[in-house]
Swiss-Prot record:
GO terms for cellular component: mitochondrion; nucleolus; nucleoplasm; nucleus; transcription regulator complex. It is an enzyme of class 5 (isomerase). The active site is at residue 142. The gene is Pus1. Residues 57-68 have a biased composition (Basic and acidic residues). Its main location: nucleus. Residues 32-75, 403-423 are annotated as: Disordered. This is Pseudouridylate synthase 1 homolog. Belongs to the tRNA pseudouridine synthase TruA family. The modification Phosphothreonine is found at residue 422. Pseudouridylate synthase that catalyzes pseudouridylation of tRNAs and mRNAs. Acts on positions 27/28 in the anticodon stem and also positions 34 and 36 in the anticodon of an intron containing tRNA. Also catalyzes pseudouridylation of mRNAs: mediates pseudouridylation of mRNAs with the consensus sequence 5'-UGUAG-3'. Acts as a regulator of pre-mRNA splicing by mediating pseudouridylation of pre-mRNAs at locations associated with alternatively spliced regions. Pseudouridylation of pre-mRNAs near splice sites directly regulates mRNA splicing and mRNA 3'-end processing. InterPro entries: PsdUridine_synth_cat_dom_sf, PsdUridine_synth_TruA, PsdUridine_synth_TruA_a/b_dom, PsdUridine_synth_TruA_C, PUS1/PUS2-like, TruA/RsuA/RluB/E/F_N. It comes from the Eukaryota. One of its GO terms (biological process) is RNA splicing.
Length: 423
Protein backbone atom coordinates (compact mmCIF):
# COMPACT_ATOMS: atom_id res chain seq x y z
CA UNK A 1 0.00 0.00 0.00
CA UNK A 2 1.42 3.27 -1.05
CA UNK A 3 1.46 6.42 1.06
CA UNK A 4 -1.51 8.09 -0.74
CA UNK A 5 -3.74 5.08 -0.02
CA UNK A 6 -2.62 4.99 3.62
CA UNK A 7 -3.45 8.69 4.00
CA UNK A 8 -6.93 8.21 2.45
CA UNK A 9 -7.66 5.31 4.84
CA UNK A 10 -6.69 7.42 7.81
CA UNK A 11 -9.02 10.21 6.72
CA UNK A 12 -11.95 7.78 6.27
CA UNK A 13 -11.51 6.44 9.80
CA UNK A 14 -10.92 9.87 11.44
CA UNK A 15 -14.46 10.08 12.88
CA UNK A 16 -14.03 6.70 14.63
CA UNK A 17 -10.63 7.62 16.04
CA UNK A 18 -10.09 6.90 19.77
CA UNK A 19 -7.23 8.37 21.75
CA UNK A 20 -5.01 5.72 23.24
CA UNK A 21 -1.51 5.79 24.54
CA UNK A 22 0.92 4.28 22.08
CA UNK A 23 3.29 5.09 19.30
CA UNK A 24 2.42 7.99 17.04
CA UNK A 25 1.74 7.19 13.38
CA UNK A 26 4.60 8.43 11.27
CA UNK A 27 3.80 11.47 9.18
CA UNK A 28 1.02 12.80 11.40
CA UNK A 29 1.47 15.97 13.47
CA UNK A 30 1.15 15.85 17.26
CA UNK A 31 -2.43 16.46 18.43
CA UNK A 32 -1.70 18.01 21.78
CA UNK A 33 -3.81 21.14 22.21
CA UNK A 34 -6.57 20.07 19.79
CA UNK A 35 -10.08 20.32 21.14
CA UNK A 36 -11.34 17.08 22.67
CA UNK A 37 -14.76 15.73 21.76
CA UNK A 38 -17.06 15.95 24.81
CA UNK A 39 -17.23 12.18 25.10
CA UNK A 40 -13.48 11.99 25.53
CA UNK A 41 -13.02 14.94 27.87
CA UNK A 42 -13.46 12.81 30.99
CA UNK A 43 -11.21 10.00 29.78
CA UNK A 44 -7.83 11.62 29.52
CA UNK A 45 -4.90 9.28 29.18
CA UNK A 46 -2.02 9.32 31.58
CA UNK A 47 0.12 12.34 30.74
CA UNK A 48 3.18 10.22 31.48
CA UNK A 49 2.42 7.68 28.73
CA UNK A 50 5.26 7.68 26.31
CA UNK A 51 4.32 8.92 22.87
CA UNK A 52 0.65 9.35 23.88
CA UNK A 53 -1.54 12.25 22.90
CA UNK A 54 -2.66 14.54 25.70
CA UNK A 55 -6.22 15.93 25.51
CA UNK A 56 -6.74 19.22 27.30
CA UNK A 57 -10.06 20.78 28.29
CA UNK A 58 -9.78 24.58 27.86
CA UNK A 59 -13.41 25.67 27.53
CA UNK A 60 -13.86 27.10 31.08
CA UNK A 61 -11.54 29.73 32.64
CA UNK A 62 -10.20 29.10 36.09
CA UNK A 63 -12.31 30.35 39.01
CA UNK A 64 -11.44 30.91 42.62
CA UNK A 65 -13.33 28.70 45.03
CA UNK A 66 -14.38 30.23 48.31
CA UNK A 67 -16.72 28.58 50.77
CA UNK A 68 -17.53 25.80 48.29
CA UNK A 69 -18.94 28.24 45.71
CA UNK A 70 -17.49 29.52 42.48
CA UNK A 71 -16.36 33.12 42.73
CA UNK A 72 -15.44 35.31 39.79
CA UNK A 73 -12.07 37.08 40.12
CA UNK A 74 -12.49 40.75 41.23
CA UNK A 75 -12.61 43.50 38.64
CA UNK A 76 -9.68 45.87 38.56
CA UNK A 77 -11.10 49.31 37.83
CA UNK A 78 -8.84 52.36 37.63
CA UNK A 79 -9.29 54.95 40.36
CA UNK A 80 -10.20 58.49 39.39
CA UNK A 81 -9.86 61.78 41.29
CA UNK A 82 -13.25 63.38 41.90
CA UNK A 83 -14.96 65.92 44.13
CA UNK A 84 -18.27 65.35 45.90
CA UNK A 85 -20.73 68.10 46.79
CA UNK A 86 -22.11 67.32 50.26
CA UNK A 87 -24.93 68.66 52.40
CA UNK A 88 -25.56 67.61 56.00
CA UNK A 89 -27.23 68.58 59.24
CA UNK A 90 -24.54 68.67 61.91
CA UNK A 91 -26.76 68.15 64.94
CA UNK A 92 -25.63 65.11 66.91
CA UNK A 93 -22.19 64.99 65.26
CA UNK A 94 -18.81 66.01 66.65
CA UNK A 95 -17.86 67.86 63.50
CA UNK A 96 -16.88 66.89 59.98
CA UNK A 97 -13.38 65.47 60.38
CA UNK A 98 -12.92 61.82 61.26
CA UNK A 99 -11.09 61.05 64.50
CA UNK A 100 -9.57 57.59 64.19
CA UNK A 101 -9.28 55.98 67.59
CA UNK A 102 -12.17 58.01 69.05
CA UNK A 103 -15.20 55.96 68.02
CA UNK A 104 -17.30 57.45 70.82
CA UNK A 105 -17.36 60.78 68.96
CA UNK A 106 -19.34 60.28 65.76
CA UNK A 107 -18.43 62.53 62.83
CA UNK A 108 -19.83 63.18 59.36
CA UNK A 109 -16.82 61.51 57.75
CA UNK A 110 -17.46 58.31 59.72
CA UNK A 111 -20.80 57.90 57.97
CA UNK A 112 -19.40 59.01 54.60
CA UNK A 113 -16.48 56.56 54.57
CA UNK A 114 -18.76 53.71 55.65
CA UNK A 115 -21.12 54.51 52.75
CA UNK A 116 -18.23 54.66 50.26
CA UNK A 117 -17.04 51.19 51.29
CA UNK A 118 -20.53 49.67 51.23
CA UNK A 119 -21.27 51.20 47.83
CA UNK A 120 -18.11 49.64 46.38
CA UNK A 121 -16.36 52.94 45.60
CA UNK A 122 -13.28 52.27 47.71
CA UNK A 123 -11.68 49.15 49.22
CA UNK A 124 -12.25 48.52 52.89
CA UNK A 125 -8.67 49.28 53.92
CA UNK A 126 -9.06 52.85 52.61
CA UNK A 127 -11.60 53.41 55.35
CA UNK A 128 -8.96 52.95 58.04
CA UNK A 129 -6.29 54.94 56.20
CA UNK A 130 -7.93 57.81 54.29
CA UNK A 131 -4.57 58.89 52.85
CA UNK A 132 -4.77 55.93 50.48
CA UNK A 133 -7.64 57.61 48.65
CA UNK A 134 -6.10 61.13 48.91
CA UNK A 135 -9.09 62.34 50.93
CA UNK A 136 -9.40 66.05 51.77
CA UNK A 137 -12.27 68.26 52.88
CA UNK A 138 -12.64 71.98 52.07
CA UNK A 139 -13.68 73.05 55.55
CA UNK A 140 -13.40 71.33 58.92
CA UNK A 141 -16.80 72.19 60.33
CA UNK A 142 -17.01 71.62 64.07
CA UNK A 143 -19.51 70.14 66.48
CA UNK A 144 -23.13 70.91 65.60
CA UNK A 145 -22.26 72.93 62.48
CA UNK A 146 -24.19 72.07 59.30
CA UNK A 147 -23.24 72.40 55.64
CA UNK A 148 -25.17 72.98 52.44
CA UNK A 149 -22.13 73.10 50.14
CA UNK A 150 -19.22 71.13 51.58
CA UNK A 151 -16.81 69.72 48.99
CA UNK A 152 -14.43 66.79 49.49
CA UNK A 153 -11.83 65.43 47.07
CA UNK A 154 -10.81 61.76 46.86
CA UNK A 155 -9.93 58.88 44.54
CA UNK A 156 -12.64 56.30 43.88
CA UNK A 157 -13.74 53.59 41.49
CA UNK A 158 -16.28 55.27 39.20
CA UNK A 159 -18.95 52.60 39.42
CA UNK A 160 -22.33 52.87 37.69
CA UNK A 161 -25.00 54.96 39.47
CA UNK A 162 -22.37 56.02 41.97
CA UNK A 163 -24.36 58.85 43.61
CA UNK A 164 -27.46 56.73 44.12
CA UNK A 165 -25.42 53.89 45.59
CA UNK A 166 -23.54 56.14 48.02
CA UNK A 167 -26.72 57.90 49.15
CA UNK A 168 -28.47 54.56 49.69
CA UNK A 169 -25.99 53.86 52.50
CA UNK A 170 -26.19 57.33 54.10
CA UNK A 171 -28.75 58.66 56.59
CA UNK A 172 -31.29 61.07 55.10
CA UNK A 173 -29.68 64.10 56.81
CA UNK A 174 -26.43 63.52 54.86
CA UNK A 175 -26.63 63.73 51.06
CA UNK A 176 -24.20 63.67 48.14
CA UNK A 177 -25.69 66.20 45.72
CA UNK A 178 -23.10 66.26 42.94
CA UNK A 179 -19.89 64.78 41.53
CA UNK A 180 -17.23 66.14 39.17
CA UNK A 181 -13.92 64.84 37.80
CA UNK A 182 -10.84 66.91 38.67
CA UNK A 183 -7.11 66.87 37.98
CA UNK A 184 -5.05 64.12 39.58
CA UNK A 185 -3.27 66.45 42.00
CA UNK A 186 -6.39 68.36 43.08
CA UNK A 187 -6.70 69.11 46.81
CA UNK A 188 -10.05 70.58 47.83
CA UNK A 189 -8.64 72.53 50.79
CA UNK A 190 -5.59 74.00 49.06
CA UNK A 191 -7.42 74.84 45.83
CA UNK A 192 -10.29 76.60 47.62
CA UNK A 193 -10.13 80.38 47.09
CA UNK A 194 -12.89 81.36 49.51
CA UNK A 195 -15.66 80.03 51.70
CA UNK A 196 -19.14 81.39 52.30
CA UNK A 197 -20.86 80.76 55.63
CA UNK A 198 -24.29 81.79 56.79
CA UNK A 199 -25.47 82.31 60.34
CA UNK A 200 -29.20 81.95 61.04
CA UNK A 201 -30.48 83.61 64.22
CA UNK A 202 -33.79 84.80 65.68
CA UNK A 203 -34.17 88.54 65.13
CA UNK A 204 -35.00 89.21 68.79
CA UNK A 205 -31.21 88.99 69.20
CA UNK A 206 -31.10 92.54 67.75
CA UNK A 207 -33.76 93.95 70.08
CA UNK A 208 -32.56 96.67 72.46
CA UNK A 209 -31.32 95.42 75.83
CA UNK A 210 -34.26 97.09 77.60
CA UNK A 211 -36.72 94.70 75.94
CA UNK A 212 -37.50 91.15 77.01
CA UNK A 213 -34.62 88.83 76.11
CA UNK A 214 -36.88 86.42 74.22
CA UNK A 215 -39.76 88.44 72.81
CA UNK A 216 -41.19 86.19 70.08
CA UNK A 217 -43.40 89.00 68.84
CA UNK A 218 -40.34 91.11 67.96
CA UNK A 219 -39.97 92.02 64.29
CA UNK A 220 -36.80 93.53 62.84
CA UNK A 221 -37.36 97.09 61.61
CA UNK A 222 -35.84 98.47 58.42
CA UNK A 223 -33.78 100.94 60.46
CA UNK A 224 -32.29 98.23 62.66
CA UNK A 225 -31.54 96.03 59.65
CA UNK A 226 -29.74 98.97 58.06
CA UNK A 227 -27.67 99.46 61.22
CA UNK A 228 -26.80 95.76 61.31
CA UNK A 229 -25.61 95.82 57.69
CA UNK A 230 -23.58 98.98 58.26
CA UNK A 231 -21.73 97.32 61.13
CA UNK A 232 -21.23 94.03 59.27
CA UNK A 233 -19.74 95.93 56.32
CA UNK A 234 -16.99 97.20 58.64
CA UNK A 235 -15.52 93.69 58.63
CA UNK A 236 -14.80 93.85 54.88
CA UNK A 237 -11.14 93.97 53.95
CA UNK A 238 -8.06 92.69 55.77
CA UNK A 239 -7.99 92.94 59.56
CA UNK A 240 -6.16 91.42 62.50
CA UNK A 241 -8.70 88.98 63.98
CA UNK A 242 -6.59 87.71 66.89
CA UNK A 243 -9.37 88.77 69.30
CA UNK A 244 -11.85 86.60 67.39
CA UNK A 245 -10.12 83.30 68.12
CA UNK A 246 -8.25 81.68 70.99
CA UNK A 247 -5.48 80.35 68.79
CA UNK A 248 -3.57 83.42 67.63
CA UNK A 249 -1.46 86.15 69.16
CA UNK A 250 -1.78 89.80 68.08
CA UNK A 251 1.49 89.75 66.13
CA UNK A 252 1.04 86.46 64.30
CA UNK A 253 0.76 87.06 60.54
CA UNK A 254 -1.81 84.27 60.19
CA UNK A 255 -4.22 86.24 62.41
CA UNK A 256 -4.79 88.63 59.51
CA UNK A 257 -7.75 87.50 57.44
CA UNK A 258 -9.42 88.92 54.34
CA UNK A 259 -13.23 89.28 54.32
CA UNK A 260 -14.82 89.82 50.90
CA UNK A 261 -18.38 90.55 52.05
CA UNK A 262 -20.70 90.31 55.05
CA UNK A 263 -24.36 91.29 55.21
CA UNK A 264 -27.75 90.37 56.71
CA UNK A 265 -30.62 89.30 54.46
CA UNK A 266 -34.29 90.22 54.84
CA UNK A 267 -35.96 88.45 57.80
CA UNK A 268 -38.55 85.68 57.49
CA UNK A 269 -40.94 83.96 59.90
CA UNK A 270 -40.83 80.26 60.86
CA UNK A 271 -43.31 78.77 63.32
CA UNK A 272 -44.26 82.23 64.56
CA UNK A 273 -40.65 83.23 65.24
CA UNK A 274 -38.78 85.70 63.02
CA UNK A 275 -35.30 84.74 61.79
CA UNK A 276 -32.62 86.39 59.68
CA UNK A 277 -29.57 85.00 57.88
CA UNK A 278 -26.15 86.69 57.99
CA UNK A 279 -23.81 85.74 55.14
CA UNK A 280 -20.04 86.15 55.18
CA UNK A 281 -17.51 85.31 52.46
CA UNK A 282 -13.81 85.18 53.21
CA UNK A 283 -10.62 83.53 52.06
CA UNK A 284 -10.45 81.47 55.25
CA UNK A 285 -11.61 81.60 58.85
CA UNK A 286 -10.12 80.73 62.21
CA UNK A 287 -11.73 78.78 65.00
CA UNK A 288 -14.79 80.65 66.37
CA UNK A 289 -14.07 83.70 64.19
CA UNK A 290 -17.50 83.96 62.55
CA UNK A 291 -19.39 83.38 65.79
CA UNK A 292 -17.40 86.15 67.48
CA UNK A 293 -17.93 88.49 64.54
CA UNK A 294 -21.68 87.97 64.87
CA UNK A 295 -21.56 88.17 68.67
CA UNK A 296 -19.81 91.55 68.72
CA UNK A 297 -22.29 93.11 66.26
CA UNK A 298 -25.22 91.80 68.33
CA UNK A 299 -23.68 93.34 71.47
CA UNK A 300 -23.34 96.72 69.71
CA UNK A 301 -26.87 96.73 68.25
CA UNK A 302 -28.40 95.78 71.62
CA UNK A 303 -26.59 98.66 73.31
CA UNK A 304 -24.10 96.74 75.43
CA UNK A 305 -20.99 97.83 73.51
CA UNK A 306 -19.95 101.05 71.72
CA UNK A 307 -19.24 100.95 67.99
CA UNK A 308 -15.65 101.94 68.69
CA UNK A 309 -15.01 98.45 70.06
CA UNK A 310 -14.77 97.19 66.47
CA UNK A 311 -11.68 99.27 65.73
CA UNK A 312 -10.15 98.38 69.10
CA UNK A 313 -10.66 94.66 68.48
CA UNK A 314 -8.37 94.81 65.42
CA UNK A 315 -5.50 96.33 67.39
CA UNK A 316 -2.96 94.53 69.55
CA UNK A 317 -4.98 95.17 72.71
CA UNK A 318 -6.84 92.16 74.10
CA UNK A 319 -10.58 92.86 73.78
CA UNK A 320 -13.42 90.87 75.31
CA UNK A 321 -15.42 89.60 72.29
CA UNK A 322 -18.54 87.49 72.99
CA UNK A 323 -19.03 84.28 71.01
CA UNK A 324 -22.52 83.64 69.63
CA UNK A 325 -23.97 80.08 69.84
CA UNK A 326 -22.88 77.61 67.20
CA UNK A 327 -26.39 76.39 66.38
CA UNK A 328 -27.09 78.71 63.45
CA UNK A 329 -23.74 78.37 61.65
CA UNK A 330 -23.86 76.70 58.21
CA UNK A 331 -21.16 76.22 55.56
CA UNK A 332 -23.02 77.63 52.56
CA UNK A 333 -20.56 77.34 49.67
CA UNK A 334 -16.90 76.94 48.73
CA UNK A 335 -15.26 78.69 45.78
CA UNK A 336 -12.61 77.53 43.26
CA UNK A 337 -12.24 80.57 41.01
CA UNK A 338 -8.52 80.18 40.20
CA UNK A 339 -8.92 76.47 39.44
CA UNK A 340 -11.84 77.21 37.13
CA UNK A 341 -9.86 79.89 35.30
CA UNK A 342 -6.98 77.49 34.66
CA UNK A 343 -8.76 74.19 34.02
CA UNK A 344 -12.46 74.94 33.64
CA UNK A 345 -12.18 75.86 29.97
CA UNK A 346 -9.41 73.54 28.78
CA UNK A 347 -11.86 71.09 27.22
CA UNK A 348 -10.66 68.24 29.44
CA UNK A 349 -12.04 69.20 32.85
CA UNK A 350 -15.31 70.55 34.16
CA UNK A 351 -15.43 73.86 36.01
CA UNK A 352 -16.32 73.42 39.67
CA UNK A 353 -19.63 75.21 39.35
CA UNK A 354 -22.69 73.79 41.09
CA UNK A 355 -25.38 75.92 39.45
CA UNK A 356 -27.30 72.84 38.33
CA UNK A 357 -27.36 71.54 41.90
CA UNK A 358 -28.73 74.78 43.41
CA UNK A 359 -32.26 73.40 43.50
CA UNK A 360 -31.18 70.33 45.45
CA UNK A 361 -29.11 72.48 47.83
CA UNK A 362 -32.06 74.76 48.57
CA UNK A 363 -34.40 71.81 49.05
CA UNK A 364 -32.00 70.19 51.53
CA UNK A 365 -31.70 73.39 53.58
CA UNK A 366 -35.47 73.76 53.70
CA UNK A 367 -36.02 70.12 54.67
CA UNK A 368 -33.19 69.46 57.13
CA UNK A 369 -31.02 72.44 58.10
CA UNK A 370 -33.49 75.27 58.74
CA UNK A 371 -36.08 73.10 60.56
CA UNK A 372 -33.33 71.74 62.82
CA UNK A 373 -32.17 75.24 63.73
CA UNK A 374 -35.73 76.43 64.39
CA UNK A 375 -36.78 73.43 66.48
CA UNK A 376 -33.53 73.35 68.47
CA UNK A 377 -33.77 77.07 69.21
CA UNK A 378 -37.32 76.59 70.49
CA UNK A 379 -36.43 73.55 72.59
CA UNK A 380 -33.04 74.63 73.98
CA UNK A 381 -33.31 78.43 73.78
CA UNK A 382 -29.59 78.69 73.04
CA UNK A 383 -29.77 82.27 71.73
CA UNK A 384 -31.88 83.51 74.65
CA UNK A 385 -29.48 81.92 77.16
CA UNK A 386 -26.47 83.45 75.43
CA UNK A 387 -28.08 86.92 75.35
CA UNK A 388 -28.39 86.74 79.14
CA UNK A 389 -24.57 86.51 79.35
CA UNK A 390 -23.88 89.75 77.45
CA UNK A 391 -24.16 92.06 80.52
CA UNK A 392 -21.23 90.27 82.17
CA UNK A 393 -18.82 91.22 79.35
CA UNK A 394 -16.61 94.28 79.80
CA UNK A 395 -16.57 96.06 76.44
CA UNK A 396 -14.91 99.24 77.69
CA UNK A 397 -11.83 97.56 79.15
CA UNK A 398 -9.66 94.63 78.15
CA UNK A 399 -10.50 90.97 78.13
CA UNK A 400 -8.29 90.55 81.21
CA UNK A 401 -10.46 93.03 83.07
CA UNK A 402 -13.56 91.10 82.13
CA UNK A 403 -12.03 87.88 83.39
CA UNK A 404 -11.50 89.47 86.81
CA UNK A 405 -15.29 89.68 87.28
CA UNK A 406 -15.45 85.89 87.46
CA UNK A 407 -18.11 85.80 84.75
CA UNK A 408 -18.44 82.53 82.88
CA UNK A 409 -20.54 81.61 79.88
CA UNK A 410 -22.78 78.59 80.60
CA UNK A 411 -21.19 75.38 79.36
CA UNK A 412 -24.36 74.42 77.49
CA UNK A 413 -23.65 77.22 75.05
CA UNK A 414 -20.10 76.06 74.43
CA UNK A 415 -21.15 72.74 72.96
CA UNK A 416 -21.22 73.75 69.30
CA UNK A 417 -17.77 74.74 68.20
CA UNK A 418 -17.49 77.24 65.42
CA UNK A 419 -16.48 77.33 61.82
CA UNK A 420 -13.18 75.58 62.28
CA UNK A 421 -11.42 76.54 59.05
CA UNK A 422 -8.17 76.57 60.93
CA UNK A 423 -4.69 76.51 59.46
Amino acid sequence: MGFPRLWAALLRNWGRWTARPGPRVPGLPPMAGNKVPPALASHQPDRKGRGGWVWEETEHPAKRVKGGEDEEPPRKLPKRKIVLLMAYSGKGYHGMQRNLGSSQFRTIEDDLVSALVQAGCIPENHGTDMRKMSFQRCARTDKGVSAAGQVVSLKVWLIDDILDKINSHLPSHIRILGLKRVTGGFNSKNKCDARTYCYMLPTFAFAHKDRDVQDESYRLSAETLQQVNRLLACYKGTHNFHNFTSQKGPREPSARRYILEMYCEEPFVREGLEFAVIKVKGQSFMMHQIRKMVGLVVAIVKGYAPESVLERSWGEEKVDVPKAPGLGLVLERVHFEKYNQRFGGDGLHEPLDWTQEEGKVTAFKEQYIYPTIVSTERDERSMAQWLNTLPIHNFSGTALGAADTGAKVPSSLEGSEGDGDTD
